[in-house]
């Protein structure tokens, strides 16, 4: 049967409509690119967090994010409890067997707790962690047949994906920086060394605009005055989008949300962020 001309595009229109509905239902944020057809999409899925975004996932103190669409598939941090990490992996249909690299931001249990369970599921990975970690950590990684790689300074771990290198004094920590066509995307664990210091380090590595920063900012003890100074630094550094979560603090998250308005990205377990044209 041939459709008459007024209706011949109806199946295509309906397909697009239902695709958009499905995407919204899954809780993803897609950055519009003016109608371009992206060859590849950079995709971030929050697997572990103490805030809920997608129903059916479990919350707990900690952070983990799966990064897909780069040259390598990367798991950034692994949360606290292996069983909760694996529950959310199942609900979100994340495939840990496709992970090539695991980045551990710092040596706190709410970021390392699910690592060895993840390695048991997929040992064919390289684990990047700060050089200050105790030697036993690397030995445990290697005992599970994975490759252990310490990090002390900025390094490119795959095409367009960088680590800041170990930062901080009492608590050593690293963050992840991706050079995307929209600008730098920065993923943080807890930002013990100071979120503004991380942003500046990222700009030192790649002198490009900061498109998005998300993760834990560790600001719960900051006063309103201090927060205004931090937000002013974000604006001075021309950060376009912000997604504060995990250890940032509820009041502090509210201030970021107010300051960034529609450019604030709400975070939580099951949150999916997509950056096209990568």
Features from the language model and the residues they span:
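Zn-dependent metallo-beta-lactamase
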Residues: 7-70, 153-166, 268
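Short, structured coil segments at secondary-structure junctions
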Residues: 92, 123, 143-144, 238, ...
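Cap/insert and terminal regions of metallo-dependent hydrolase folds
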Residues: 114-117, 184, 190-273
